């Protein structure tokens, strides 16, 4: 079901944990877990020694690429459950395992019958996703069957939980039945997910003008706008994505909405800044980020004239993640400051 309503959270609610305990007869860990930034810190400090990735390209997606690589290399074991190779498979712990799995476009015959999963979009719509393509290999397993297999193997070491892992993967309706009983909003899950177009999860303000606030009304908050003032010679760098990109997957080098093509190591800069520094378009430069007295330098970038406010520059994600210091995070969310990085730029002769 994914990481939105489905419960993938390093700080799950007591209500959700209680529901899991009632459904499966186990006692889930209630200790608060670690977000992405904290996980990298824990691996670097040796507090976490096993890293398991359910898809994705953690190394490339994470801030401070070199620090993240160092943390992964400190692990005793790194495991990647993946549909295709990526950079994270090449930077590993002492022992590394790659478990290839079926992609959502591939036909899933786990349990001897056609299976499907559901996905949830950012609008809160849940719908079924059925693969039809021939799998790349007859030996590929689905993600649910891989996870169940890992669980069964662990239980042979640490003791049985009472969960029938084989039944969960023999028919994915069984998994969805458990989701229905543990996550609010998934009533009649197996029936509704088969409806063309799927179904909407509850949204109290939309559904009935109900606001879960202390006043029972919609609360509006105003904040004063703040500008980040940088020292002379510095810029504020933001990372962006191109048109032909989905997360860390790059499908081509044609960012057609911006009129940029042929490469990705570009520094988009205002014309006035280029002229004021005596630079020129397509000039090769290095970028250095600055945070709390520390610096990170990355070379091999090219200046592109672009309609962006003076003293601001833009670079593509994930190539410029290397410049975002691990400790440079947003207040509250603890997410990397990918839209606000202080940098200086120097020409390379």
Sequence positions of predicted segments:
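Non-catalytic alpha/beta scaffold blocks inside enzyme catalytic domains
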Residues: 1-179, 233-236, 240-349
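Segments of small-molecule ligand-sensing domains
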Residues: 188-200
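Short acidic, Pro/Gly- and aromatic-enriched capping/linker segments at domain boundaries
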Residues: 199-207
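Short, flexible helical or helix-coil boundary motifs
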Residues: 182-186
């Amino acid at each position: 079901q994914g990481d939105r309503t489905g419960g993938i959270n390093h700080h799950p609610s007591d209500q959700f944990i209680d529901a899991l305990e009632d459904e499966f007869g186990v006692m889930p860990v209630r200790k608060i877990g670690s977000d992405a930034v904290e996980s990298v810190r824990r691996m670097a400090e040796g507090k976490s020694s096993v890293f398991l990735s359910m898809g994705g390209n953690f190394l490339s997606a994470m801030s401070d690429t070199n620090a993240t690589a160092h943390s992964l290399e400190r692990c005793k074991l790194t495991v990647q459950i993946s549909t295709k190779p990526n950079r994270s498979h090449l930077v590993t712990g002492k022992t590394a395992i790659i478990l290839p799995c079926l992609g959502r476009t591939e036909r899933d015959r786990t349990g001897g019958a056609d299976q499907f999963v559901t996905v949830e979009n950012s609008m809160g719509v849940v719908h079924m996703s059925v693969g039809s393509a021939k799998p790349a290999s007859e030996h590929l397993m689905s993600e649910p069957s891989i996870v169940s297999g890992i669980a069964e193997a662990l239980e042979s070491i640490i003791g049985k939980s009472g969960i029938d892992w084989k039944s969960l993967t023999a028919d994915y309706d069984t998994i969805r039945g458990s989701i229905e009983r543990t996550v609010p909003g998934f009533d009649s899950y197996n029936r509704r997910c088969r409806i063309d177009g799927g179904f909407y999860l509850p949204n109290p303000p939309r559904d009935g003008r109900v606001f879960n606030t202390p006043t029972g009304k919609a609360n509006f908050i105003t904040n004063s706008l703040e500008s980040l003032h940088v020292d002379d010679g510095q810029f504020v760098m933001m990372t962006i994505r191109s048109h032909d990109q989905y997360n860390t997957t790059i499908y081509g080098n044609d960012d057609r909405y911006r009129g940029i093509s042929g490469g990705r190591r570009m520094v988009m800069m205002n014309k006035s800044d280029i002229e004021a520094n005596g630079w020129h378009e397509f000039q090769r430069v290095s970028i250095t980020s600055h945070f709390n007295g520390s610096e990170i330098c990355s070379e091999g970038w090219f200046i592109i004239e672009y309609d962006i406010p003076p003293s601001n520059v833009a670079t593509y994600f994930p190539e410029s993640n290397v410049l975002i210091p691990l400790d440079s995070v947003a207040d509250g969310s603890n997410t990397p400051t990918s839209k606000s990085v202080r940098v200086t730029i120097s020409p390379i002769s």
